[in-house]
């Protein structure tokens, strides 16, 4: 995915359930075309097939370092690829995995031509996990996730320190998330060194999700 990028994590919010995910995906695709910004959406896992294959990045919210075959219940990269999914979020604060799984998953996704977005809690973890050279490192201080208090205003130094921490990591790009709700939050994050945004409740639980997507995308254009 080219920069800048906006990733919308729908988590397991009821606002993204059933057919409502199509409305979010349509709004995201429209904003991407209007503002020339790359947008990806991570729907609830069981809804991946509904929007996969659209002219829109589609990410799994989690992926397992397991193989195809007799691996009941696991989310397998190769089957995601065959279903039109373009990449995966790894190590989200709500679904943490050991570093050795990150080490296995990042090259596996790369080998399939898929995007890896590795979430970290702080600059130290950014430095540690960037050695596996994912496409993106997403810095999200857990205390700000879903708070409505933006990392770019509450903890701006975290973005700057994370950008510095991954500087020598072979083209890894920095995203930031946690509390992003407005175009002003986005602009500030980009000024601080982020190359994109990972957002969840600020869009999905908004009274006007399409309007929220448009505001964030416009700030990145």
Swiss-Prot record:
It catalyses: D-glyceraldehyde 3-phosphate = dihydroxyacetone phosphate. GO terms for cellular component: cytoplasm. Disulfide bonds: none annotated. InterPro entries: Aldolase_TIM, TIM_sf, Triosephosphate_isomerase, Triosephosphate_isomerase_arc. The keyword DNA-binding does not apply. Keywords: Cytoplasm, Gluconeogenesis, Glycolysis, Isomerase. GO terms for biological process: gluconeogenesis; glycolytic process. The active site is at residues 92, 140. Gene3D superfamilies: Aldolase class I. It is found in: Cytoplasm. Belongs to the triosephosphate isomerase family. HAMAP family: TIM_A (MF_00147_A). Homotetramer; dimer of dimers. Involved in the gluconeogenesis. Catalyzes stereospecifically the conversion of dihydroxyacetone phosphate (DHAP) to D-glyceraldehyde-3-phosphate (G3P). This is Triosephosphate isomerase.
């Amino acid at each position: 995915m080219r920069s800048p990028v906006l990733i919308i994590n729908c988590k397991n919010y009821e606002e993204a359930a059933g057919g409502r995910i199509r409305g979010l995906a349509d709004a995201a695709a429209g904003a991407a075309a209007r503002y020339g910004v790359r947008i990806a959406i991570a729907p609830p896992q069981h809804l991946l097939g509904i929007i996969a294959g659209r002219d829109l990045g589609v990410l799994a919210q989690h992926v397992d370092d397991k193989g195809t075959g007799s691996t009941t219940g696991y989310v397998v990269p190769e089957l995601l690829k065959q279903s039109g999914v373009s990449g995966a979020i790894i190590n989200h604060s709500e679904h943490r995995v050991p570093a050795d799984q990150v080490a296995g998953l990042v090259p596996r996704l790369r080998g399939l031509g898929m995007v890896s977005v590795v979430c970290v809690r702080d600059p130290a973890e950014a430095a540690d996990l960037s050695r596996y050279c994912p496409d993106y490192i997403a810095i999200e201080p857990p205390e700000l996730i879903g708070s409505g208090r933006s990392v770019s205003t509450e903890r701006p130094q975290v973005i700057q320190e994370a950008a510095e921490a991954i500087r020598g990591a072979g083209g890894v790009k920095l995203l930031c998330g946690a509390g992003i709700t407005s175009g002003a939050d986005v602009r500030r994050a980009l000024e601080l060194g982020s190359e994109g945004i990972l957002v969840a409740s600020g869009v999905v639980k908004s009274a006007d999700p399409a309007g929220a997507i448009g505001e964030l995308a416009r700030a990145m254009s």
